[in-house]
């Protein structure tokens, strides 16, 4: 509720807001002295202190994010108050996007927090979408190994919120979205063989991108047809996942018209995992209001 912002202020108003031990005296209530948080800048840290210094003082640190931001580290946002037991409140305004440019988090409840934090999200918190991290399916050489290796997997999507410290309550009336996983690469086509020798099949396609902050979801690229003697086509890359969804496995390569002995088409790569809306990275949390949208586990 806070101390009155005008009119008469008594020691009882201050005790009601900040607590303390009897007998009460104003010297208990210096700013950053353990009872009064640093956001109450009118309250001195030492020296003369008077009742009127406490007009509008509140026993919590409130930060509001009203503009877009990326990779928000709450220990930096709250500064020295992060390691204080003073309650903390983070408000994210409607229409504000908090995004991830790395695969770790868009917003992180950092290590070392003391006390509690209440996160009130009315905006949109978006994890990073996955990218293909391995090769599309291919044959290492024109002749040699009969069966190509499995195509590379798609990268995982990143979480929207990472929880490292306990004591967080998350109220969501907006949207919290983990990144989508990338699609796996398409498998290489089966080797062919004719009287002229063995011939490699076509390369597989690349996996698609997962949906994420500043990244649209894409489908995989098509597999290629290679040597005329093989007449086998590489498999298509798997499409990336939407926000909070896994990428798809790439397609297996096609069969050759004239198959080389003991040869098989290459397998498609696995799709990347979905990013969590809220992820336990060492600590649990409490879901408060959940009337908003979640894309990914929470």
Name each model-derived stretch:
Residues 2-298:
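Glycine-centric low-complexity repeats
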